[in-house]
Curated annotation (Swiss-Prot):
Belongs to the UvrC family. It comes from the Bacteria. Residues 346-381 are annotated as: Disordered. It comes from Paraburkholderia phytofirmans (strain DSM 17436 / LMG 22146 / PsJN). PANTHER family: UVRABC SYSTEM PROTEIN C, UVRC/OXIDOREDUCTASE. Interacts with UvrB in an incision complex. The keyword Acetylation does not apply. Keywords: Cytoplasm, DNA damage, DNA excision, DNA repair, Excision nuclease, SOS response. Residues 208-243 form the UVR domain. The UvrABC repair system catalyzes the recognition and processing of DNA lesions. UvrC both incises the 5' and 3' sides of the lesion. The N-terminal half is responsible for the 3' incision and the C-terminal half is responsible for the 5' incision. This is UvrABC system protein C.
C-alpha cells in the first residue's frame, strides 16, 4: 500500500516514482479526504502515470486531476482480484466520479424451510444453508405469484411454525384445496416430501420432469386400483398444465436468463433488468445509477461547459511540478467538475496492453446467428455511456451474487476479466449475448422499451418535483440559489388515546424524500395525549445537539480563520451550510398542526436561538383533503391559504402525509409490541430467551395463557415448578 501524506503540496512525481509495475487498485482523494475515483490497473505505475501525462489528457480529465491531493494504491495478485477489490471499494466509498448503483441487498426470494414439513415463504435478507432459496426475483409480486402457483399445484403449507405446531383442525386453505394440511397429519411425510421435491424442480424450470413423474404416479395408483389417489394426481397434473398454458411468455427451453437493457436520456441513464427463470418471465426492475452525470458528455445529455476555460484549467494544473498554484478564478471553474464528463475519457492503460486486450474476446457462445460481444477499444465502439454503465452494473450486481447461465445485453461489456470472474464465481459457463435471436430478442426489445418508459417517467417526475420546490420557495418568499440543497424537515405526533406516543421526522431534499434520513422518537415523561408536550420534546431533542455542535464548529472555524488571516490577510471566510453532528440544519421546518403546535415550536426555536422564520405549520383541512390546508407562520406573517391546484401546496401535502404515514406505522408497531408482550414481561422467572421460546411455541400471548402446566413445562428451559408458577401468574 502506497499512502502519501497530504499535509504538504501534492507532488505527483514523488508518488509515481514509488508505484510498482504490478496489478492493483488506485484511489484518488481531494484535499478534504473525500474519494474522487477508484480504478483498477494491470500495471499500477503505467495506469496512474497516464493521468499526469499532458499529451493524453482531455480538459475534462484534467479538471478531476486538479482536485487530486492524495493517491493510495493496493497491490493485488491478479487483475481479476483487482476487479473484485475495485467493485467492493466503489460500493463502500461511493466515489463522486465512479458510476454507482445502489447496493440492493433486499432482493426477494422464495424460501422452502428445512422443517420436517417444509414451509413455503416470501423472504428478504441473507441466505443460509439450512433452507432452500429460489431467486432472486425482481419484485415481491413475482415471489407471491410463484407462491400462489405452488399452492394451486403442490399445496405446500405457508403458515408459521408456531401456528403449524398448534393446529387442531385444518385451516381454510385446506378446505379450498390450497394446502394438504400436514399440521393435522392429513398427508404423510413421504408424500409431502415428494410434493416439495416437485415444487423445487418446478422452480428450477424442470417442469417436464415433474409432469412425467406425476403421470407415472397416476398410472401406478390406477393399476393398484387406488382411484381416489389417482384422481388427486390427475387434478394436480391438470393444475400444472393450466399454469404452464397460462404463461404469457415462453422460451421453449428450461434455461435461466437475465436481460439487461441500458438507455440514456436527458442526462440520466436507466438499466432495466428482466429475469426469466425456467422459461417464465418474472418481470423487470429499473435501476438509476448515481454520479452518472459526471460520465455524460454534452451530446449525451450532460451539462455543457466552456471548453476553452477548461483547457486553461488543464494547462494550469496538469504539471508534474508540485508548487503550481491555481488562482481564484481557475479554482471557481474547477468547481464545475461535478457535472463534467469524466468516466468515458479516463485514460486507458498503455498502448501495448490495449492492443493485447483488443485481441481478446469476451466469453460468449453463438446461437443461431447471434454475434458475440466484443471488447472495446475506445468508447465509441461500445455505444457510449450505455456500455460504461452496463459494465458497472454487471460488476456491482453480480459479483458476490448468483449469476444465471445466460446474460442478454443491449451493449457489449468491455472487460474480459469481468466475465472471467463471473464464470469462476458461478462455477458454470456464463454466456453473454449481444444480438440474440427469437424469443430472447423479443425480451431484449421489451426490456429496452421498459427502460425508456421508466426513464421518461423519472424525468417527468423530477421536472414536476423541481417545479413544486420552486413554487414553494416563491410562495414563502425565500431566496434559494440551488433548489437541490433546499432541505425540509417535517414533524408529526401519533398515538392512540395517549398510548405508545411517537414523533416522526421525515426529510426532503434534492427534490425527493430521503427515507434513509427519517427518524422516529419515542416520547416519554409527558401526560398521555399531550401533543404540545410531545412536540416540544421532539423538537428539543432533534435540534438542541445540532445547534450546540454547529456553534462549536463555528468557533473552531473562526479560530482557524483568525490564525490563517494573521498569516495571510487576503483570506476571506467561505460561506457554508451549518453542519452539525446530527446533520445539516434544515431550510424549512414543517409542523403538522395548527396555531398551538406552531407556538410550541416557536418557543423551542427561540430558546435554541434558531430562526423562527423557517417554521411553517400545516393546519389540516376537512378530512385531510389537499387544498383545504392553511399555512401558519411562527414569525407573525398572516396565515396563507393556497388553492388545491397550487404546486407549492402539493409539495407541502406530500411531505406532511409522508410524516403522518411514518409516524402511524411506528406507533402501531410499538403499540402492538407493547400489547403482545407486556404481560409476559411481567412474569417472574421469565427472561428474554424464555419469553421468546414461549412465543415461538404457542404463537402469542393468547396461546401461552391457554396452555396447560404440562404444555408450559414442555418448552425448553422451563421446569415443572416454573411452569406451575407461570400458570398461576397468568390465571
Amino acid at each position: 500500500m502506497t499512502e502519501p501524506e497530504a499535509t504538504d503540496a501534492f507532488e505527483p512525481k514523488k508518488v509515481l516514482a514509488q508505484l510498482p509495475h504490478l496489478p492493483g487498485v488506485y484511489r484518488y482523494y481531494d484535499t478534504h479526504g473525500a474519494v474522487l475515483y477508484v480504478g483498477k490497473a494491470r500495471d499500477l505505475k503505467k495506469r496512474v502515470s497516464s493521468y499526469f501525462t499532458k499529451t493524453l489528457l482531455s480538459p475534462r480529465i484534467a479538471m478531476m486531476v486538479t482536485r487530486i491531493a492524495r493517491i493510495e494504491t493496493t497491490v493485488t495478485r491478479s487483475e481479476a482480484e483487482a476487479l473484485l477489490l475495485e467493485n467492493n471499494l466503489i460500493k463502500a466509498l461511493a466515489p463522486r466520479y465512479n458510476i454507482l448503483f445502489r447496493d440492493d441487498k433486499s432482493y426477494p426470494y422464495l424460501k422452502l424451510t428445512g422443517h420436517k414439513f417444509p414451509r413455503m415463504a416470501y423472504y428478504r435478507g441473507a441466505v443460509d444453508r439450512k433452507n432452500q432459496y429460489f431467486g432472486p426475483f425482481p419484485s415481491a409480486w413475482a415471489v407471491r405469484e410463484s407462491i400462489q402457483i405452488l399452492q394451486r399445484v403442490f399445496q405446500l403449507r405457508t403458515c408459521e411454525d408456531s401456528v403449524f405446531n398448534n393446529r387442531t383442525r385444518p385451516c381454510l386453505l385446506h378446505q379450498i384445496g390450497r394446502c394438504t394440511a400436514p399440521c393435522v397429519a392429513a398427508i404423510n411425510e413421504e408424500d409431502y416430501a415428494r410434493d416439495v421435491a416437485n415444487a423445487s424442480r418446478f422452480l428450477l424450470g424442470r417442469q417436464g420432469e415433474v409432469m412425467k413423474e406425476l403421470e407415472q404416479k397416476m398410472h401406478a395408483f390406477a393399476s393398484e386400483l387406488k382411484f381416489e389417489q389417482a384422481a388427486a394426481v390427475r387434478n394436480q397434473m391438470s393444475s400444472l398444465s393450466t399454469v404452464l398454458h397460462q404463461q404469457a411468455i415462453e422460451v421453449g427451453s428450461d434455461s435461466d436468463v437475465d436481460i439487461l437493457a441500458v438507455v440514456a436520456l436527458g442526462g440520466r441513464v436507466c438499466v432495466n433488468l428482466a429475469m426469466v427463470r425456467g422459461g417464465r418471465h418474472l418481470g423487470d426492475k429499473a435501476y438509476f445509477p448515481a454520479h452518472v452525470e459526471s460520465a455524460l458528455t454534452a451530446d449525451e445529455g450532460g451539462l455543457q461547459e466552456d471548453d476553452a476555460a477548461l483547457a486553461s484549467v488543464a494547462l494550469a494544473s496538469n504539471s508534474l511540478a508540485g508548487d503550481d498554484v491555481i488562482d481564484d478564478e481557475t479554482a471557481a471553474l474547477a468547481d464545475t467538475a461535478d457535472a463534467l464528463a469524466i468516466a468515458q475519457e479516463m485514460p486507458s492503460e498503455d498502448e501495448e496492453n490495449e492492443q493485447n486486450d483488443a485481441a481478446e474476446e469476451v466469453d460468449v457462445a453463438e446461437e443461431a446467428g447471434s454475434e458475440p460481444a466484443k471488447p472495446r477499444k475506445g468508447r465509441a465502439a461500445t455505444g457510449g455511456i450505455e456500455a460504461e454503465v452496463l459494465e458497472a452494473f454487471i460488476a456491482q450486481h453480480y459479483l458476490g451474487n448468483r449469476v444465471p447461465p445466460v446474460l442478454v445485453v443491449s451493449h457489449a461489456p468491455a472487460n474480459r476479466e469481468l466475465v472471467d470472474v463471473l464464470i469462476e464465481q458461478a462455477g458454470h459457463k456464463v454466456t453473454v449475448l449481444r444480438q440474440p435471436q427469437g424469443q430472447r430478442r423479443a425480451w431484449l426489445t421489451m426490456a429496452e422499451q421498459n427502460a425508456r418508459l421508466a426513464l421518461a417517467r423519472l424525468l417527468s417526475e423530477q421536472g414536476s418535483q423541481q417545479a413544486r420546490t420552486r413554487a414553494l420557495t416563491d410562495t414563502l418568499g425565500m431566496e434559494c440559489d440551488d433548489l437541490a440543497h433546499l432541505r425540509i424537515e417535517c414533524f408529526d405526533i401519533s398515538h392512540t388515546m395517549g398510548e405508545a406516543t411517537q414523533a416522526s421526522c421525515v426529510v426532503y431534499h434534492h427534490h425527493k424524500m430521503q427515507s434513509s434520513e427519517y427518524r422516529r422518537y419515542n416520547i416519554t415523561g409527558i401526560t398521555p395525549g399531550d401533543d404540545y408536550a410531545a412536540m416540544r420534546q421532539v423538537l428539543t431533542r432533534r435540534y438542541e445537539k445540532m445547534v450546540e455542535q454547529a456553534a462549536a464548529n463555528a468557533a473552531d472555524e473562526a479560530a482557524e480563520l483568525q490564525s490563517d488571516a494573521a498569516a495571510d490577510p487576503s483570506l476571506t471566510p467561505d460561506a457554508a451550510e451549518p453542519v452539525a453532528a446530527g446533520g445539516i440544519l434544515p431550510t424549512i421546518v414543517l409542523i403538522d398542526g395548527g396555531k398551538g403546535q406552531v407556538e410550541i415550536a416557536r418557543q423551542v426555536f427561540t430558546e435554541l436561538g434558531l430562526d423562527t422564520g423557517m417554521l411553517v405549520g400545516v393546519a389540516k383541512g376537512e378530512g385531510r383533503k389537499v387544498g383545504l390546508e392553511t399555512l401558519i407562520f411562527a414569525d407573525g406573517r398572516a396565515p396563507l391559504e393556497l388553492g388545491k391546484e397550487s404546486a407549492a401546496l402539493m409539495l407541502v401535502a406530500q411531505i406532511r402525509d409522508e410524516a403522518h404515514r411514518f409516524a402511524i406505522t411506528g406507533m402501531r408497531a410499538k403499540r402492538g409490541k407493547t400489547r403482545q408482550t407486556s404481560r409476559l414481561e411481567e412474569l417472574e422467572g421469565v427472561g428474554a430467551k424464555r419469553r421468546q421460546r414461549l412465543l415461538a411455541r404457542f404463537g402469542g400471548l393468547r396461546g401461552v395463557v391457554a396452555a396447560s402446566v404440562e404444555d408450559l413445562a414442555s418448552v425448553e428451559g422451563i421446569s415443572q415448578a416454573l411452569a406451575e408458577q407461570i400458570y398461576r401468574q397468568l390465571h
